[in-house]
Amino acid sequence: MSELDQRGAVHGVFWTAIQSIGVRVFSLLVFIVLARLLTPSDFGLLAMAGVFVVLGDALVAQGFGAAITQREQLEPEHESTAFWTNMALGLALGALLWAAAPWIAALYGQDALTSVIRWLSPVIPLRGAVAVPVGLLQRRFRFRALAIRSVLAALLGGVAGMLAAFLGWGVYALVVQQLVGASLDLIVVWSAVAWWPKLAYSIRHLKDLIGYSSYLLGSGLLGLLSRRADDFLIGVVLGD
């Protein structure tokens, strides 16, 4: 490994550690405050909705972003095609979740869940819009920008959630936290990446990315389902 590569590795480890510690600390502090202002049922509603939001997030955030990061020969057409595919998928999944909200609420036996899910549904296209830029930042070893993005989203999203909780918004304070965090994530990433997609789409370049991204997506979804299946089943059984 060259000296430049070693410096890049050390730089990456340092900022990744800053990101991990910062997000954990701010998230914990925000949770402590929100736990004093909100009820367990508020957190329960968000957890029920979160199962589906996290699933949609995984579908748009995993796969293409990692393929952009790790593919050896990357052309502008790969980047633009991956971005437009992610945007279309994110919008479609967000719309599907919005439409399915009443049925999900009925499954859980929680009428209030319909509105919560619908307000959270924009998180999915917001995540889809940053997957490729994040992949490009990782490819360029821009770990400092990635760390700032995550810490700011956790901090300011948490502040927004706490303000909403102080105003008596109940479960929607948690929704505000998620929406503000995802929006700040989008703003910081796009400010840092210095890249714009072309108005072009290539099936050939899409096929180049699908093989690798489908493997990552499949393994990521299996891991996600194994972690969140219990949450879903408990919500269905105890929802009434």
Identify the function of each model-found stretch:
Residues 7-27, 45, 49, 54, ...:
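Membrane-water interface segments that mark the loop-to-transmembrane alpha-helix transition
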Residues 10-23, 76, 122, 136-162, ...:
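Alpha-helical transmembrane segments of multi-pass membrane transporters/permeases
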Residues 9-10, 67-76, 126-150, 167, ...:
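Membrane-interface junctions at transmembrane-helix termini in multi-pass inner-membrane proteins
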Residues 114-121, 149-195, 211-214:
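Hydrophobic alpha-helical transmembrane segments
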Residues 12-20, 50, 86, 119-120, ...:
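Residue-level signature of transmembrane alpha-helical cores of multipass secondary-active transporters
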Residues 1-5, 9, 144, 171, ...:
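Interhelical loop/hinge segments that connect adjacent transmembrane helices in multipass membrane
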Residues 21, 25, 29, 33, ...:
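Generic alpha-helical transmembrane segments of integral inner-membrane proteins
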Residues 28-42, 105-107, 165, 224-240:
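Helix-terminus/linker motif at the lipid-water interface of multi-pass membrane proteins
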